[in-house]
Structure formats: structure tokens, C-alpha cells
Amino acid sequence: MRRCLALLIVSLLALTLTAQTPSEVEITAEPGHHLALENQYVRVFKVEVAPHAATLMHRHRHDYIYVTLGAAHVENDVAGKPPVTISLQDGETHFLPSGFAHIAKNLSDQPFRNITIELMQDEKAHRSPPPKWDEERGLHILNGGTEDILFAKDGARAAELQLQPGGVLPKHHHAGPHLVVAVTDLDLRSDIEGKGASKVQLKAGDVSWEKGGFTHTLTNAGKQNAKLITVEFQ
């Protein structure tokens, strides 16, 4: 009788714990994650969570970079760990390794928005580390702006570029492709060596995939300060 009672109690506890644990979904099935772009290098989601709302418990199976759009105050509930409260600034960019599931709770009165960039070649980079970049961290003072190389992970290098009206990023070469994330509205002019000038116009929160193999200068042709994040690949 005692054995049966003990088994019943254990079963009830297991059922209670199961009921208290949110069911886990893939990131592609999480309603706040909207697929914006996908290729062999990246899978990019535009993320939006309403004020005082939360995502579903979802799993990150790839290392990823996220770019915050607008100031944010969120609670990060990682499965199996205590909740952590985080304050983020507009354009703040971070790298996180994969292998966890979490819920993101928006604690503010404004929508929480970010761009989540999954690095699709992370496992390959773990097995065989890619060549080092010529520079993996550093701040460059430009003519009317700054270029801040933030970090290099999994064969990808992230940088923040800020240009005042008329500010210029000097001539540089893109051997591989790169992703552009517009933190502000962008009205840029790209002067490509051997091809001439072209416009780059994006709204805040837009993303653009650029193929490599070209050399150019980049100028803020607009009347407002321009801020963007680039994630480039070798």
C-alpha cells in the first residue's frame, strides 16, 4: 500500500512539473520571429514582441548575432536557469552560442524589436576554425564618423558604422559577402571601383545581403546621422 502511494505521489509530481514547463518550439515556429532572409551563411529573423508580452519557449540550434532596434528592457528566461533582466540600447549587438531554449519577456511599454542572425556555418567553424581576420576588434575614426569592429565569431565579423551627413567610409575591399542591418533610416552612396555610384536606401530595421568581390567607398548622402551593423564573411 505504501509503495503504491509513493508511486502515485511521484507520478503526480512528474505531471505537475510537466505542466509547469512551457512546451518548446523551433525558432521557425515562434510567432514573434519572422524570417527575412536565408542562405548558406545566415538565416535572418525580424523579431517583435508586444509591450509586456513574451515569446514562446523556443530553441536556438545555431550560434547567432542579434541587433537591438530601439532601447529595450527584457527578461531572459533560459530553460533550467534563473531569469535575467537585461537593458539594451538602440543598435546594441551581441553574439550568443547555441544550445539553449528560452523565453524573452518584454518588460517595457514599447515593442521589443531585434534582428536575429543565425550563423549557418557555425558547426563547420567549430570543427575547423576559419582563418583569422586581419583585425577582430578596433575603433576607427573616420572623416565624419566611426567604424567599430565589435567581434569575430564562426568566420563572421560584426562591425558598427556611424556616419554623419557627408561622412565617408574610405575605400575598402569586400572579398566575401556581407549582411547590412539598418539601425536608422539609410540614404547612402556606394562608389564602386570600376562601376560608378549607386544608392543604398534602407529603412530602420531593414536587412540587405551584399555579394562580395568589389572595392568601394561609402558616403552618407542623407541629412540625418546614419547607423548600421555589418556582418561580413570570409
Q: What residue ranges belong to the model's regions?
A:
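Positively charged n-region of N-terminal signal peptides that target proteins for export
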Residues: M1-C4
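Bacterial N-terminal signal peptides
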Residues: A6-T16
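A short, N-terminal "cap"/entry segment at the start of jelly-roll beta-barrel domains
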Residues: Q20-K46, A50-L56, N76-V78, P82-E160, ...
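His-enriched metal-coordination microenvironments in redox/metal-binding proteins
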Residues: H58-H62, H102, N106, H172-G176
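Glycine- and acidic-residue-biased ligand/ion/polar-headgroup-sensing regions
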Residues: R61-A79, H174-G194
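Active-site scaffold segments
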Residues: I65-T68, T93, L179-A182, V207-E210, ...
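Short, well-ordered beta-strand segments in beta-rich or mixed alpha/beta enzyme
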Residues: T68-L69, A104, T116, L163, ...
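Short, charged beta-turn/beta-strand-edge "cap" motif at the junction between a beta-strand
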Residues: F100-A101, F214-H216
